[in-house]
């Protein structure tokens, strides 16, 4: 499953950003898309992005004229996807919409087979790319293109990381090696829980993507029969420094925290504290100043308490830098898996849960 290191750039269909994009998928077929829409989407994209993941019914959901459909599933067999397909087909107006775009393996899987029979455009996920490693397939590039953002720059960021790994030199190669070494050393000392805490609300969904990547790849029975792995914890700085920080500092010493910040100039703003504000000095500050101080304050408090901290700074919140970050972590996960003598690219226990679900539903 090492195909995630080869980044193709297939032609993408033109989607209208002024119309809703209904994205049916879950897990690795949704989280990269959700990450990029939340990171880069404007107000219009936020309104028009409609992820359809859980099989539960959404009250009062109706199709609208101009809705654009994407059905995304690497295997083409995802139960939640087929549930939403059935639900959408039963709604008034489905037959008036353009044929859905499919993002899946271009093989004989049920989704691809249905798509070919119904005139759908198929954007392929390479067979050798695991679902949770699919950010650099159309799972990631299609929503970027829909929003009018630079999908090529996103891929370029990923390629830069892979290029440095292949020649075994460069800042990304060094950062990846240092991170792997730190996490392995922590693992040997019993620190198996790690928090990713970006100080940027736009990166909240990036933490969700990272959680799946880490948990599904590295929670395994190793070759020697021992249970190994890491437990990832999702957080976002401006929120969770007021909630989870207490446990991290005063609770069991079995975790570390990755504090992620974004550098670069912020758009200027004016703060006008009212009379009686306990913080009149806000008039000379901006929100970005406060966010940076919070990140440094939290990091300092964690380090003073003896909690391992990995500082990770993005030079800018743009497609290239986010692409590089996501590719770096895919590489980190692969290297950690091999070092722990487990397969980071399978998920047998997930498959067991699916089989039990199908049996209970009488679906196979």
Positions of predicted regions on the chain:
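Non-catalytic alpha/beta scaffold blocks inside enzyme catalytic domains
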Residues: 127-155, 294, 301, 306, ...
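Internal helix-turn-beta structural module
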Residues: 308-309, 314-354
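Cofactor-/ligand-binding subdomain signature composed of acidic, glycine-rich
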Residues: 1-19, 336-343, 347-349, 355-364
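Active-site-proximal helix-loop elements at catalytic-domain edges
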Residues: 1-6, 100-102, 313-321
